[in-house]
């Protein structure tokens, strides 16, 4: 049944007030603070209907109402307005998520995680997706000092790893380029399982007197492929939960911290598959997380999902602000990853 406009406006006012103040909302508060053009008595009757419909709930007979999970869902789907970013906020996002072709993806994403936590005042979580059977896309070798070479490895999933190796004698740039060409011709497209003894011996044979260079490179090569084949979970701003007075309660705080410290739970909660996903309270599949909301989105490299970034907090988070921040940050991550791919 379609809810009438007046009830929607009252519900919107209740949720906005509860998000901002964390206190149950009464009809007199709505009548005074929100210019709805109706009396407190009418609002009270409408609130009784909203409670009966399951959109708000009353904690005690003498208290006002607070939104239910069902109420928040209607709010997110139909009532909230996504704000525009200020120029200062847009500049902050672009400045923090650095654009650099040699910038390692995990560092870029960790910067984005810190930024989301800072801008939303909530706990931000990043889950890097498992890139099973990752392979080498390219290897670059650069002289940086006498007897020191910078090795840059890039996998198909966009992971970049920089390593410095020391060599016994200086190597000319032309020789270094030839070594890199041989390595790329032999290793490009190979997974860690495919780099077997036969491949290694063939590379050393082609490198001749520079075979020792490959011995120095191999451990780093294996490291990046192992890293690309694993799933990592990072978090930032855990203590931000204490910005919400209700989490001064030791039991509620312990409940939240136990969720944040459980990698299995975070791995399940942060499973967005496309654009921004919002899971509210009981919509979370994990029982321990049913007092919280999770807002997350996938970031991509070359069109391929590379990880999930999002926040977890109480159900009264400022949804419109959080969704906008995550949308903008993910767009900026994707733009930078695309530039890396084209560089």
UniProtKB/Swiss-Prot annotation:
It comes from the Bacteria. Keywords: Repressor, Stress response, Transcription, Transcription regulation. Induction: By heat shock. One of its GO terms (molecular function) is DNA binding. Pfam families: HrcA (PF01628), HrcA_DNA-bdg (PF03444). GO terms for biological process: negative regulation of DNA-templated transcription. HAMAP family: HrcA (MF_00081). Negative regulator of class I heat shock genes (grpE-dnaK-dnaJ and groELS operons). Prevents heat-shock induction of these operons. This is Heat-inducible transcription repressor HrcA. It comes from Clostridium acetobutylicum (strain ATCC 824 / DSM 792 / JCM 1419 / IAM 19013 / LMG 5710 / NBRC 13948 / NRRL B-527 / VKM B-1787 / 2291 / W). The gene is hrcA.
């Amino acid at each position: 049944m379609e809810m009438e406009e007046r009830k929607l406006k009252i519900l919107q006012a209740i949720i906005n007030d509860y998000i901002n103040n964390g206190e149950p909302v009464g009809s007199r508060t709505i009548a005074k603070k929100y210019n709805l053009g109706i009396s407190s008595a009418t609002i009270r009757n409408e609130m009784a209907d909203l409670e009966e419909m399951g959109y708000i709930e009353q904690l005690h007979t003498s208290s006002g109402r607070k939104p239910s999970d069902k109420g928040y869902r209607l709010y997110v789907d139909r009532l909230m307005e996504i704000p525009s970013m200020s120029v200062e906020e847009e500049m902050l996002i672009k400045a923090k998520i650095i654009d650099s072709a040699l910038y390692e993806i995990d560092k870029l994403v960790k910067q984005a995680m810190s930024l989301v936590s800072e801008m939303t005042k909530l706990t931000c979580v990043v889950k890097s997706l498992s890139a099973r059977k990752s392979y080498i896309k390219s290897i670059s070798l650069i002289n940086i000092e006498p007897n020191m070479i910078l090795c840059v490895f890039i996998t198909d999933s966009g992971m970049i790893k920089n390593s410095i190796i020391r060599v016994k004698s200086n190597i000319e740039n032309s020789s270094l380029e030839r070594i890199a060409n041989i390595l790329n011709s032999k290793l490009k497209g190979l997974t860690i399982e495919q780099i077997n003894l036969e491949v290694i011996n063939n590379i050393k044979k082609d490198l001749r007197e520079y075979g020792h260079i490959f011995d120095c490179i191999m451990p780093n090569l294996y490291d990046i492929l192992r890293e690309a084949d694993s799933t990592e979970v990072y978090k930032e701003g855990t203590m931000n939960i204490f910005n919400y007075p209700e989490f001064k309660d030791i039991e509620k705080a312990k409940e939240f911290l136990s969720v944040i410290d459980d990698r299995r739970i975070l791995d399940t909660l942060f499973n967005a598959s496309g654009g921004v996903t919002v899971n509210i309270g009981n919509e979370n599949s994990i029982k321990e997380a049913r007092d919280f909301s999770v807002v997350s989105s996938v970031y991509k490299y070359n069109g391929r999902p590379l990880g999930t970034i999002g926040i977890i907090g109480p159900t009264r988070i400022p949804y419109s602000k959080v969704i906008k921040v995550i949308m903008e940050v993910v767009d900026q991550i994707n733009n930078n990853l695309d530039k890396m791919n084209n560089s």
